[in-house]
Amino acid sequence: MSGDFRVTLLGTGVPIPSPERFGPCTLVEAGDQELLIDAGRGATIRLYQLHVPISRIDLQLLTHYHSDHTSCLPDIWLTGWLESHFGTRKTPYKVIGPTGAKRLMENLERAYADDIKIRVADEKLPLSGIATDVTEYDRDGPVYEKNGVKVIAFEVDHGDVIKPCYGYRIEYGGRVAVFSSDTRYNHNVIKYGKGADLLVHEVAMARPELMKEAYIQRIIGHHTTPYDCGRIFTQTKPKLAAFTHVVQLASIAVPPPTLHELVAEVRQTYDGPLEVGEDLMSFEIGDAVTVKRLMSHS
């Protein structure tokens, strides 16, 4: 078994399309396993850039069912089945998520039933590779354990009606990576994030002049401000804190806050190691957490 523990941000963006920040998705490589957290827009393209065949994905974890976190799910599931150097999955697509995962995958199977039928008849693809193996959960606790990799789900607070929504703590080789998912300031993130080697957290910010707008207040109210992220990082004390799902709100008249402004607000409450995540940024987790920027459009 390999001792490698690596986290790569495949997509660090939001529902609004961006060529620089694809939809939320994170690749976790732990020993001999490859796990995906969420499946936002463009995840398959980022996997291709990393030379990671979709058929190598051992487990798809879902945090919640907002479309920006699931829109690439059918692409990963279907394209990973096709006969190619990038696919050729012959075993069921394994999915773990909070209540709703089974309904989501059953509906995808119905939506693509004609395509599946045609490809089986025309390309002789195995039905075993398009089958799904879905596990749901509805409370905090371990949801997966195999070959030294342990995944613990914990509920977070993405808003009063945006439920269920969960984060993940992944343990391997005595190391820990924690992923907040979409959430407001939440004590469960602090509980499960304490002492993590890497804590990957969402963040949202708008300029003060935009905060008077009701829809902006509503969006910010579903996420964590840089100031509150700093409070969380100060209490959890990770070796490295990193942002993903970077929400920089704007309007026609008001530009988005800059990343410099975002970091400046974090520094009001946190003075430790910090990275503002970028697509294809990776973190090698060992005695220290090493950051690599891998963005490439080749």
Predicted regions and their residues:
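Binuclear metal-dependent hydrolase catalytic cores
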Residues: 1-177, 256, 261-290
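A polyampholytic, Gly/Pro-enriched intrinsically disordered region
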Residues: 292-298
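Cap/insert and terminal regions of metallo-dependent hydrolase folds
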Residues: 167, 174-176, 184-281
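Short glycine-rich anion-binding loops that position phosphate/pyrophosphate groups of nucleotides
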Residues: 156, 205-206, 295
